[in-house]
Amino acid sequence: MKSELNKIEHYLIHRDSLNKEVSKVAVAWHLDHSLKVINKIYDSLKDSNPDMYKNKFSTARTLSFTFGYIPRGKAAAPLSVQPPDTIMTADIVSQLVEAREKVRKIESLDDQSNFKHPVFGQLNKKQTKRFLEVHTKHHLKIVKSILKE
């Protein structure tokens, strides 16, 4: 995740770039959303009860995690991780600092720490780390497409 967080920082200078053929929202939205997801999911893992984790098979999760792919435009972000209408660069920077710290701290959590994803179901720590990687890369690919890189 260190590489992905560095890319988020790199793309900050393009925060206002928009290409409506690729995405309805600007680069800043994708950066802010990605960081909100990392930070909120870490909090969910930290606050979870490891004894409540139950492994359950999910075809969608298996395919997404195996291929490292999330289809574009198929799911809407939950309100809790949607950026505000006005996204401040300073807010993205502070979320980036927070995300770097939380990514470091995730290793110290119990392996059965968990959070419930709306599509993939209950994820343990290992699965959550994979989700965060796949999800962040998904939004970074959209940013690259917006910028025509």
What do these predicted regions represent?
Residues 44-96, 103:
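Short, helix-capping/interhelical loops that line the mouth of catalytic, cofactor-
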Residues 14-15, 75-83, 116-119:
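A short small-residue
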Residues 8-11, 15, 106-109, 146:
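A short secondary-structure junction motif
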Residues 4-11, 33, 37, 95, ...:
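Amphipathic, well-ordered alpha-helical segments in soluble domains
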Residues 1-27:
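Charge-rich, low-complexity N-terminal segments
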Residues 17-65, 110-149:
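Short, contiguous alpha-helical
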Residues 1-2, 24-31, 85-96, 126-129:
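Amphipathic, non-membrane alpha-helical segments in soluble helical-bundle scaffolds
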Residues 96-117:
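Active-site oxyanion/phosphate-handling segment shared across diverse enzymes
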